[in-house]
Amino acid sequence: MGKLDETMFFDFGDNKQNDVRETLKTVYDALEEKGYNPIDQIVGYLISGDPAYIPRLNDARNLIRKHQRDEIIEELVRYYLSEQIADSKKEEN
């Protein structure tokens, strides 16, 4: 069997995760700069889907709308759980 007969695998997951992380950082900074509580505003957006929770400052509103809300939630859960697992392993040692 030649190399051309083998199934190729393409995974763009890490790039998408990094993109979501960068977007969340930008949105968080924009919300802080405007004087809003970033956590409350991001949660409001994720629950409602209403982009009015996110300011236009630094193009934050357009950036967050590039991602599906479920993708953002998935990344937040992934990050939270990985931190919790890492912390519990530190406590075991």
Curated annotation (Swiss-Prot):
Pfam families the UniProt entry points to: IreB (PF06135)
InterPro entries found in the cross-reference section: IreB
Superkingdom of origin organism: Bacteria
Listed HAMAP family: UPF0297
Annotated family: Belongs to the UPF0297 family.
Protein name per UniProt: UPF0297 protein PEPE_1262
